[in-house]
A protein has these predicted regions:
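Short, well-ordered coil/turn segments that N-cap beta-strands
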Residues: 11-16, 43-45, 81-85, 122-126, ...
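Terminal-tail/helix-coil boundary detector
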Residues: 207, 231-256, 260-261, 275-279, ...
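N-terminal small/glycine-rich loop or linker at the start of catalytic domains
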Residues: 7-26, 88-101, 124, 129
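N-terminal binding-site loop/beta-alpha segment at the start of enzyme catalytic domains
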Residues: 1-84, 151
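Conserved, mostly hydrophobic/aromatic
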Residues: 6, 18, 32, 47, ...
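A short acidic, helix-capping loop that chelates divalent metal ions and anchors anionic groups
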Residues: 53-59, 94-100, 291
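Glycine/proline-rich, positively charged
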Residues: 93-193, 200
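Aromatic-lined glycan-binding groove of carbohydrate-active enzymes
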Residues: 196-233, 264
Length: 328
């Protein structure tokens, strides 16, 4: 496994980040522990979760359970593992029935951090990420709460998730004025089929020195070789079948290119991300040990300039005309 700095920090993380959104939901605790064991053995030292993970992932989710954090916490208790990993979690989502049980008020940040530490059975979080932007809370309040956690040793670094480019700029401007390090990483939806962040978020990350952690690198499985795989699980749903038909011409060209390269579609999709200098580590979310093992090979794949150009032709970037394409 190769390692790189997380953004402009001195912290070294693996080129793949293990996402645990499925832990406690579609993946039971025993399998989750096996995935964590296999990841650590393979050299993955970057593990990402969130307080809300472990609940059934659906658009109408009402309240998080913290189950994913609890599973990781019980795994960490088995000795010697905490010192070998970089542990990241998130704050923002609804975690209780009260009016202050969500978002990024100082009240909720303090309580959410304490709850995450308890569930994770650790005394500190390495990277504490804001899961979404909160337009109801001033940045001065957010940073004051985060600075206190850092001063107390409960958090080492702060990251963001699903931020727009101008949100990153605003956050960093306020942090700089307070003589605070500010954001060190951003998690964004980014893959060959979803390249909108190339307009503003990636330039913002490059400018401010944030590491980029792309989530959904395989577009929910769409880039995993769906045309030649038997439909199962999420791929068997009618909505996913319609998505395949919508992208069938591109998928046929893409999977044909991967076959010519002698690489799997999922490995090519991950390798494409890894060759972007702003990308720190794609966020992989294996549901099984076998899926994790398949993803590891991607770190050894190098795509030629011609292949990168072919991928751009199949899956074009956002493009556009000013000011939309040059808003940063």
């Amino acid at each position: 496994m190769n390692y790189t700095h997380l953004g402009r920090t001195g912290l070294k993380v693996s080129r793949l980040c293990l996402g645990t959104m499925n832990f406690g939901d579609v993946t039971d605790e025993k399998t989750s522990a096996s995935i964590l064991d296999e990841a650590l053995e393979a050299g993955i030292n970057f593990i990402d979760t969130a307080d809300v993970y472990g609940t059934e992932q659906s658009p109408d989710i009402q309240q998080g359970s913290g189950l994913s954090e609890e599973i990781i916490g019980r795994w960490l208790q088995q000795g010697g593992r905490r010192e070998r990993i970089v542990l990241a979690t998130k704050v923002y989502q609804t975690m209780g029935p009260g009016p202050n049980d969500r978002r990024l008020s100082a009240y909720h940040i303090r309580k959410a951090c304490e709850d995450s530490l308890r569930r994770l059975k650790t005394d500190h979080i390495d990277v504490y990420q804001m899961h979404h932007i909160d337009r109801h809370t001033p940045w001065e309040e957010i940073w004051q709460a985060m600075e206190l956690l850092v001063q107390q040793g409960k958090v080492l670094y702060i990251g963001s998730s699903n931020f727009a480019g101008w949100d990153i700029a605003t956050a960093q401007s306020v942090a700089t004025a307070r003589h605070f390090l500010g954001l060190v990483a951003e998690q964004s939806l980014y893959n060959l089929t979803a390249r909108t962040i190339e307009l503003e978020v990636i330039p913002a990350c490059r400018h401010f020195g944030l590491g980029l952690i792309p989530w959904s690198p395989l577009a929910g499985g769409l880039l995993g070789g769906v045309l030649k795989k038997m439909a199962s699980g999420r791929r068997a749903r009618p909505a996913f079948a319609r998505l395949i038909e919508q992208y069938r011409p591109q998928l046929e060209a893409y999977e044909g290119l991967c076959e010519d390269l002698g690489e799997t579609p999922s490995d090519v999709a991950l390798a494409w991300l890894l060759q972007n200098p702003v990308v720190t580590a794609p966020l992989i979310g294996p549901r099984t040990v076998e899926q994790l093992q398949q993803a590891l090979h991607a770190t050894t794949v190098t795509l030629s300039d011609d292949t990168m150009s072919c991928l751009d032709e199949i899956w074009p970037g956002p493009g556009g005309e000013a000011p939309q394409a040059y808003a940063w």
